[in-house]
């Protein structure tokens, strides 16, 4: 397994600086980070970030909660660049699995980053939903698990083992706060 490092930020200066470094393989951000970085317009700020990413993958998240609006936003976000991965939460605020959204977007060959994943059961559901062609990142919130005293390492190991059967799926240790 080859380890890749992604920068989790929306800070324009940091992304511009790190885009030139071979150590950083890609970027991931979300609407909250963008707001903290001073973004006033999500699309315009995203396009600004895309200009400095130099073709490296960048994950840009939908902010809709309904599945219909997630699909609509994902299609728009996907159109912004060839290196865009659209971030979709594994569940919406009502706790419903985003499987239909994932299936629709994979059928349209939209690269996805399924985010806010906490369990191996969620990883299994995602893997049953994706096709074997679309590129998919599964972002496991290891840092947040550790924050509440749960060891994320067994979940990461099991998830990597399950994802090895899919050449198009990568596991991302996400929401990092500390080294474990």
What are the functions of these language-model segments?
Residues 1-16, 21-24, 28-104, 108, ...:
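Active-site beta->alpha loop and helix N-cap motifs at the rims of alpha/beta catalytic domains
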Residues 110-180:
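Catalytic alpha/beta core domains of metabolic enzymes, predominantly
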């Amino acid at each position: 397994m080859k380890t890749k490092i992604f920068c989790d930020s929306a800070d324009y200066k940091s992304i511009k600086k790190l885009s030139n470094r071979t150590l950083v393989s890609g970027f991931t951000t979300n609407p909250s980070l963008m707001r903290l970085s001073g973004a006033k317009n999500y699309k315009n700020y995203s396009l600004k970030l895309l200009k400095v990413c130099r073709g490296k993958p960048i994950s840009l998240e939908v902010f809709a909660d309904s599945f219909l609006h997630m699909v609509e936003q994902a299609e728009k976000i996907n159109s912004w660049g060839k290196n865009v991965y659209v971030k979709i939460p594994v569940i919406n605020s009502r706790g419903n699995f985003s499987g239909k959204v994932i299936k629709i977007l994979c059928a349209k060959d939209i690269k996805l980053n399924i985010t806010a994943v906490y369990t191996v059961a969620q990883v299994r559901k995602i893997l049953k939903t994706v096709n074997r062609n679309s590129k998919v990142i599964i972002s496991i919130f290891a840092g947040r698990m550790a924050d509440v005293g749960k060891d994320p390492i067994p979940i990461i190991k099991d998830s990597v083992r399950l994802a090895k059967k899919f050449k198009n799926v990568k596991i991302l240790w996400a929401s990092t706060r500390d080294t474990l």
